[in-house]
Amino acid sequence: RGLGDVYKRQVHSVTVGDNAYVSLFKDLNVEQTSTQNSLVFAKESFLFTYGGNIYVLESMNARLYKYRVENGLLIQEKETMILPSGSLPAFLTFDSEEKAYISCVGLGKLYIINPTTMQKTGEIDLSEYAIGKESGDKNPEPGASVIRDGILYVGLAQDKSQFNPNTGAYVLLIDTKTDKPIKMISDNRATMATAYEYSGDPFIDEKGDLYIYCVGGFGYFANCTEGFLRIKKGETDFDQSYYFPIETISIPDIKGNKANYIYSKTYTGNGKLYGYFNVPGYVSNPPDYVNDKSMQTFEIDVYNKTVKKMNFDGTTGWSCSQCKAGDYMVFGMASTQGTGYYLYNYKEDKYEPLKIKTEGNPFKIQYLK
């Protein structure tokens, strides 16, 4: 299958300064993308797709936008949904054309919306599940989520302060028929279930097993361990026989032979994911998140608990987007080889470095099926 005859539509965002520019490009054969016909949002804006529509969740400005594709452009549908100031909406999970859930990290609530009409239909207060509620912390910081068998699984960061979580992994289970919480489950082997925003998990494999990655406080705290946890199909508790950390693995071909957490990742099937590892050996002192090329692409096998470095150079934390498009993984990077999209055919193990140059730093990308 050629790159041009199957993969017709990509929606992506690039960042320039404090803005994110969202636009479409035709396929993986375009040589260059431009911000000329882009929609402009605040920098931390996240892309979601459902039913042929594109949703832009503008986190810092607390707004949700809905678009359709028409003649190669993004045309807004319905009115912009304005959420409370400081709500920091970071994730959107679709149950149906009539129901979706927004994780409001800043509020400690889930908003229930109708994604067709773009109207709020309800909310779920999560304050009673906050670890620090006795001392006045009523926000468990809901992050990424997934629906399996009528249950919404929501990762809770359980922060003491920003990026400083209580130890342990916490996930809240909610009945999607009644929107009532069922229970909160926890596991002390790893910390901080999901990374606030969408980073490729939780995900469900072909067996129906649910995997969730705990980011461990982004490597800042020695007592906050990272790693994958699993909730098997038919179960609603963590599988005590499964835990897969990557920070304990000695990895050849990287400085210091160690990575301390996984950032964004994409599941492609058969237990395989592709994602970015943060490599402390490439972090300057003090850290420079804009320029340090500490994010390195890896293949991850959650079944066999192995990792393999890919043949791409490192990129920065603000330029590590990715998506699956057919048999290709598309990586948006600002590496030493240039800024843009790099391709990897995971079925044939073939690399195409800097296939598409971008105007701006790649931030998020989605493939429109």
Located regions from the model:
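Beta-propeller blade signature
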Residues: 112-115, 166-179, 224-236, 290-303, ...
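Short, conserved, GDST-rich strand-edge loop motifs in beta-rich repeat architectures
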Residues: 154-168, 212-227, 274-292
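Post-signal peptide N-terminal segment of secreted/secretory-pathway proteins
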Residues: 19-112
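Short, small-residue-biased leader/transition segments that mark boundaries at the very start
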Residues: 2-7
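Repeated scaffold domains used in trafficking and secretory/extracellular systems
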Residues: 39-51, 84-93, 135-144, 192-201, ...
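Short glycine/acidic-enriched loop and turn motifs that connect beta-strands
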Residues: 15-18, 61-63, 106-109, 159-163, ...
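Beta-propeller fold detector
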Residues: 31-40, 75-83, 120-134, 181-189, ...
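Loop/turn-rich, solvent-exposed surfaces of beta-rich toroidal or solenoidal domains
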Residues: 258-333
